Amino acid sequence: ITDYYALKSISYPAEFFDSERVIPMIAENNSIKVLADGNLEVNGVASTKLTVGLRRLAARVDVVLKSKVDFGDASSSEFEGITFSNIPDRVPLVYGLPSDCLPSSWAYADPVLPYGGTAITRNVERKLTLADNADCFKIDPTLLTTEDKNNDLVWAVKVKKVILPSSFFSSKSDETNAINFTVNLIDKYSPSCKLKILSDPDYTLPANAKLDLTGIIREPLEV
């Protein structure tokens, strides 16, 4: 790296982002001056320390699925697992900037540097199954509220701490870039949807976000 703007060509492959690895992070502190006595001047104020707020380049998604159909327990379930697809194959380092969220908000402003590295392809699939990823799943009827039961929901499962590469694109309402979410059922139609975080809609998946996804399976079809 020869200068600040060389950062815009750096990216991390999608395989760097999962719950078993240290997630790539970035932080940026501006207007820093190193004083002669070894202290710092931060935004014109003398200080003995520099606080660095790291922003993860991934998003965490916790999933809760509820159904009107009893799919059974972990040993005999018709529920196979879940799949996230249309995931970007890399995450640019600059998509983690700014590293501080907006005042009084969980949200961040759009990236401040344009990405100029290897082109991003949305061809990555992340599949989690009861058979191969049992620790991620918890079939638990206590997840159902009284209101859920009154609405004839009888089965629920939680999928915890799914780590996905963040996904940014300037046209946030472009659903062709959205991450697809599929509920995989055995010998039945597997329903799917496109993930969006706001009703605007916004199909991006922000860096450093923690999102809760609740899905209702009403009437799966046999195939």
Predicted segments, located by residue:
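Tryptophan-paired
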Residues: 1-6, 42, 60-64, 69-221
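Post-signal peptide N-terminal segment of secreted/secretory-pathway proteins
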Residues: 1-17
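Non-catalytic, regulatory and substrate/membrane-recognition segments associated with hydrolase enzymes
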Residues: 12-44
